[in-house]
Amino acid sequence: MISMDDIIREGYPTLREVANDVTLPLSDEDIILGEKMLQFLHNSQDPVMAEKMGLRGGVGLAANQLGLLKKVIAVLIPNEPEVDEDGNEIPPKEAYKMREIMYNAKVVSHSVQDAAVEGGEGCLSVDREVPGYVVRHARVTVEYYNKEGEKKKIRLKDFPAICVQHEIDHTNGVMFYDHINMNDPWEIKDGMIIVK
């Protein structure tokens, strides 16, 4: 089981290195790695498990963050509950907006329009706040292989697009704060979407 102790922090060279494609068909080792990464995200989002294991909540994880130069990422984005007229929360019909283990993921096309998360981004490998808009593509098309070894192509927008770009960046040795304009961190570029 992956814990916070397994996640390397900024300054560790692997975070700045480009990961290698995993070999297809996938090895049992790589399939298990992806499953463990996804389980970590599940645990980090479960209040009881997160407290018990001392986990910070996360929606994505890349193998680089475990010190492994493999193009393996896991993404787990929960759906938010809806609120009825009386202000009561209604559980979402689907628990997750996105739940995927992606091998050799790459962005094959993207929008010209930019987007950024309203409050900026964070990272399990960064133990400090880095304020500012992390400017990314508003929409992306991503190709990857799933754990069954099937080639997939998906179109993403809004928060899922941002999350997957963050994780793919890790496999290319790029950190989220590389996308922040350090001279004007909260600059809103023309036409940029702010994702809440």
From Swiss-Prot:
This is Peptide deformylase. The keyword Repeat does not apply. Its EC number is 3.5.1.88. GO terms for molecular function: metal ion binding; peptide deformylase activity. It holds the Pfam family Pep_deformylase. One of its GO terms (biological process) is co-translational protein modification. The keyword tRNA processing does not apply. The active site is at E167. Belongs to the polypeptide deformylase family. It catalyses: N-terminal N-formyl-L-methionyl-[peptide] + H2O = N-terminal L-methionyl-[peptide] + formate. Removes the formyl group from the N-terminal Met of newly synthesized proteins. Requires at least a dipeptide for an efficient rate of reaction. N-terminal L-methionine is a prerequisite for activity but the enzyme has broad specificity at other positions. Its cofactor is Fe(2+). Binds 1 Fe(2+) ion. Fe cation binds at C123, H166, H170. It comes from the Bacteria. Keywords: Hydrolase, Iron, Metal-binding, Protein biosynthesis. Transmembrane segments: none annotated.
